[in-house]
């Protein structure tokens, strides 16, 4: 992240004809020691996340293919299946792309893959964030509107479809704003260094700021606020129920409006929101800092930049552990 951000910061000329700009050789990004460590950790997390999420999907598949009869997954397990698919998508796209790009430093894959992979990267980051929102909304409705949810079995399916649709649409601008650029030496000759960046894609600075703010809001702030509101409302509703009839709840939870299994899924939903917040907050705080103060790259060390990004990659690795802990 730091190398490519630094490269865009150094862009001082814009040529739509040849998509090139001037830079001295010593300004070009290189693979540092901290970058090598980031690559190794990234591929390790790739293996861990792939193994964990694939194992959970296989477990769900076995549950639907019993010898006696084909069993239908519960609504919660369907939601978890889509979250796992989204996590796998993020794992197989974001992690290898980041690892390989940090090794090569520059972009060798051409204009088409520059746009396509930039689109897929953002799409695969939107999907798990939106799926966690869907799970929070589903649990919120299950507690506050249990009869309505039970009578309308398509609520969960509709929320899932909306989440995938928004992921596809909101990542669309990546196909336009990302492009390949080439570095010129001080004599004006185009060199051999190429990169995939958003150079000259926004005519006005406020347009880029607006797009960055929109992306940040949809990837982090929006999902986080929705999850917090849903979980707060759930806890408030549970507190009211416990205060209204605590004796009956203790004697027979299985017949209560909030059975033991539902309480377990609620705890899991809170765990998802907590993990999402812990993993991604450092990364996005660093991103906001860079938007308002690009010179921060000269003050924050490379190891710190790499660490914050790697912290975000822990999210798809730990989600399956949450499934396992709550024994769903």
UniProtKB/Swiss-Prot annotation:
Residue intervals on the Extracellular side: 1-38, 98-115, 185-212, 301-306
Sequence intervals crossing the membrane: 39-58, 78-97, 116-137, 165-184, 213-232, 282-300, 307-326
Membrane-topology annotation of the record: Multi-pass membrane protein
Topological region Cytoplasmic: 59-77, 138-164, 233-281, 327-328
One GO BP: cellular response to hormone stimulus
Any Pfam family matching the protein: 7tm_1
Signal sequence extent: none
Cell location: Cell membrane
Family from the record: Belongs to the G-protein coupled receptor 1 family.
Annotated protein name in UniProt: Gonadotropin-releasing hormone receptor
Gene designation per UniProt: GNRHR
């Amino acid at each position: 992240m730091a190398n490519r951000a630094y490269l865009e910061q150094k862009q001082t000329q814009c040529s739509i004809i040849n998509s090139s700009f001037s830079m001295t050789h010593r300004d070009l990004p290189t693979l540092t020691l901290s970058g090598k460590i980031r690559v190794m950790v990234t591929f390790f997390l790739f293996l861990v996340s792939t193994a964990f999420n694939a194992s959970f999907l296989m477990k769900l598949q076995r549950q639907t293919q019993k010898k006696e009869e084909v069993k239908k997954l519960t609504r919660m397990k369907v939601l978890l299946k889509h979250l796992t698919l989204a996590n796998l998508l993020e794992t197989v796209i974001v992690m290898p792309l980041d690892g390989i790009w940090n090794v090569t430093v520059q972009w060798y894959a051409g204009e088409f893959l520059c746009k396509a992979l930039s689109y897929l990267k953002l799409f695969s980051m939107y999907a798990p964030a939106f799926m966690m929102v869907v799970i929070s909304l589903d649990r919120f409705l299950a507690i506050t509107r249990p009869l309505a949810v039970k009578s309308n079995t398509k609520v969960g399916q509709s929320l899932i479809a909306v989440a995938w649709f928004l992921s596809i649409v909101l990542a669309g601008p990546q196909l336009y704003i990302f492009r390949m650029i080439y570095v010129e030496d001080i004599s004006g000759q185009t060199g051999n260094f190429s990169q995939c960046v958003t150079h000259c894609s926004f005519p006005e600075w406020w347009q880029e700021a607006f797009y960055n703010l929109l992306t940040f809001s949809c990837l982090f702030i929006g999902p986080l606020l929705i999850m917090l509101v849903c979980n707060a409302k759930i806890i408030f509703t549970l507190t009211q129920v416990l205060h209204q009839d605590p004796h009956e709840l203790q004697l027979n939870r299985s017949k209560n409006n909030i059975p033991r299994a539902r309480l377990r899924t609620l705890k899991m939903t809170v765990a998802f929101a907590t993990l999402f917040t812990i993993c991604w907050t450092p990364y996005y705080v660093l991103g906001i800092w860079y938007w308002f103060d690009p010179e921060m790259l000269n003050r924050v060390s490379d190891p710190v930049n790499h660490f914050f990004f790697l912290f975000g990659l822990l999210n798809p690795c730990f989600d399956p552990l949450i499934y396992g802990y709550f024994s769903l």
